[in-house]
Structure formats: C-alpha cells, structure tokens
A protein has these predicted regions:
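Ferredoxin-type iron-sulfur electron-transfer modules and their immediate structural context
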Residues: 1-192, 240, 279-298, 344
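Conserved beta-strand segments of alpha/beta enzyme cores
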Residues: 71, 215, 254-256, 300, ...
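N-terminal Rossmann-like dinucleotide/flavin-binding domain of flavoprotein oxidoreductases
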Residues: 128-134, 167, 229-277
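Rossmann-like dinucleotide/flavin-binding elements
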Residues: 196-219, 258-268, 273, 287-289, ...
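Residues in the short beta-alpha loop(s) of Rossmann-like NAD(P)-binding domains
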Residues: 222
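Short alpha-helix immediately C-terminal to the canonical SAM-binding loop
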Residues: 226
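Redox-cofactor binding/interface segments in oxidoreductases and associated redox assembly factors
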Residues: 281-282, 303, 325
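A short, gly/pro- and small-residue-rich
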Residues: 293-309
Length: 347
C-alpha cells in the first residue's frame, strides 16, 4: 500500500491508483469534464489538475498515478487559477448550443426561455417576434396548447412551473390589441406553392413560406380557415375572434386562401403540381378515434371530435339529460363541458 497526503488528510491506496480515484475514494472532490471510468483516460479538459510538493508542473489527476509519500493540494491558488483559465478556454470555443429543457420538450422547439425572459423585461414586441419565428398563431396556440414545455420547466423543482403557454398568449394578445406585427417579407422568389389544408399546420407553412418570398395559396374544404382550431375546439377555450385576427395577419402577407374546395373532388395533387412549384399536404386528422367496441354505431353514440364539430357548426345534437363520456383527454373534457352547456344534467 502507498501512503500519501491529500489536503492534509493521510490516506492509503493501492499501487497504480490515480490521484483522482484516490481523492474520490476518500471523499475529496476534484472537478473534471472529460473523465469517465468507462473510457480510456484522455485528460484534455485540464480541470482536474492538482499540485504535488516537489513537482514543478501541475498534475492531471485523472492520469497521474499516486506515489509513496506524495503530498497533494487540490485547492491551492495556483490550482484554482489554472482551472479557471482551462474553463475560460473551453467556453471560448463553446457554440452556446445548450438548449433549455422547456424548449427541448416543445414540439415546435419554441425558444421558451428566450421569450419568457423578454416578457419579464417588458420587451413584449421582441418576445412576440421570437415566438413567431416558430409559432405563427401564438394567441390561439397559447390558449389551447397542452404545454409540454411546462412539464419540463425546472422551476417546478423550486415551486411551480412558469406559465409558459399563457405568457405566449399574453404577448400575442398585446399585439392583436395594438398595431399588429407584420413580418418583413424577403424578395419575391417567383416560386408558387400550394398548401392543402387551412388548419394550424397549413397556416404555419403558409406563414413561413410567405415570409421567405414565395407565392402561397391555401386550399381548404371548410367554410373558414382554421381547421381543428376552429371546428374542434369550443369557443369558451378559443374565441374564434382571436383566431380570425391571427389568420388576417397571414392574409396580409399576400397568402391567398380558397375555401369550400376538397381534395379529390375539386382538385387533385397532380393538378396543383401542374400549376405550382411545390405542394404541401396538411389535411390534418378529422376523424374521431374508434374504441373498437360493439355498439359504437348505435344512435346517440358520438365520436368526440364529431360531436364537438357538430356543436361548433350549429348542427343540432340530441344528447338528452344524462351523458357518459369515455376518455379523459382534452377532447373528452371539452365534450363534458360542452354537454353541460347544452343542458345535460348529469355527465
């Protein structure tokens, strides 16, 4: 066994033990970035350096072996200064690509921490511009998004997650109630693009493509644009006046919108391709999910999405006084609340 001293503590280790391992085994912390027990020692980060009496150079503790009688200091001024310089060098070449968990959890990869910070500083217009880099309908989406960003928010480890989705809607509402932000368009490319479907995906595609200078036309089978935002989400959750205002902004980017036309009946992908340089299919998912159980075809049994769409379009739906809802997701809860609003006494 070898006898040595680390930070005034006398310890014994087996021959061949590194200084880093000896320190770790005895509860002495030495920082390191590149060390991993599962791989060959690299020693590149320079953070694990220590000072040994009688040795002029600092030693990389991840690779330097212990020797008998060694006296080691892991916290001297010289060691601390060396580690500071090593970290500064590492960070000087860092591309700043560390992404916050809220952004990683967002399907659109919205810069959540960025716009939350701007809102906190009162920079509402800058916050909106940052949001609209990814989300073209922030006032609408901010109201109905299931906000997976908040489930990843690290603030919940202290108290509660930041209300990220509502902050997005807040910045967008300020814009809609004032002088609306219309992004600057790039020079016209001469390219024509057809978008099939005027829901959130189609509208977002049209918004982004128009900004890039393309000539965009949206084709939709319904009377108005909006897709499931309009026909699948009740008014109490998403006021259609808000959705209309956001769609108007997209129209002001010279996006043409054609309603009451259906793929396969009024046009085909091939016919659109003849007139355009590209075709984007964004038709959405309009069918209710089947439970694959007997009795689904009986009178008085409705799919959740079909039920909500009928109510939103003003079509009469006879639900009686007692309603059973199978499911517990967003559509199911919307169906529950809508049934109560239609007069159901028990849901």
């Amino acid at each position: 066994m070898l006898n040595l001293t680390i930070n005034g503590k006398n310890i014994q280790v087996e021959e061949g033990t590194t200084i880093l391992q000896a320190a770790k085994d005895n509860g002495i912390y030495i920082p390191t970035l590149c060390y991993d027990e599962a791989v060959k020692v690299y020693g590149a980060c320079g953070l694990c350096v220590v000072e040994a009496e009688g040795i002029p150079k600092l030693l990389r503790s991840c690779s330097a072996k212990c020797s008998d009688g060694m006296v080691i200091n892991t916290e001297s001024d010289r060691v601390v200064q060396s580690r500071k310089i090593a970290m500064e060098l590492l960070m000087s070449a860092h591309n700043g690509d560390c992404v916050a968990p809220c952004q990683l959890n967002c399907p659109a990869r919205t810069d959540c921490q960025g716009y939350v910070g701007l809102i906190a500083n009162g920079e509402y217009e800058s916050a909106l511009k940052l949001v609209k880099n990814k989300v073209s309908l922030p006032a609408s989406i901010g109201r109905v998004c299931p906000h997976p960003c908040e489930s990843a928010c690290r603030r919940k480890n202290v108290e509660e997650p930041i209300n990220i989705a509502q902050l997005k809607a807040f910045a967008a509402d300020l814009d809609l109630n004032g002088e609306k932000y219309i992004p600057e368009k790039a020079e016209a490319t001469g390219k024509k693009i057809a978008v099939i479907g005027g829901g959130p995906a189609g509208l977002t595609a049209a918004y982004q493509l128009a900004i890039k200078g393309h000539d965009v036309t949206i084709y939709d089978m319904m009377e108005k644009m909006g897709g499931m935002l309009r026909y699948g989400i009740p008014q109490y959750r998403l006021p259609k006046e808000v959705l209309d205002s956001e769609i108007e902004i997209i129209e002001k980017l010279s996006v043409k919108m054609i309603n009451n036309v259906k793929l396969g009946k009024d046009f085909t992908i091939a016919s659109l391709k003849e007139q355009n340089d590209a075709v984007i299919v964004a038709v959405g998912a309009w069918k209710s999910s089947s439970m694959r159980t007997p009795g689904e075809e009986l009178d008085g049994v409705y799919g959740g999405i079909d039920f909500l769409r009928s109510v939103i379009q003003g079509n009469p739906v006879d639900i009686g006084e007692k309603v059973a809802v199978c499911g517990g997701g967003n559509t199911a809860m919307d169906a529950c609340r809508t049934a109560v609003r239609l007069g159901a006494k028990e849901v």
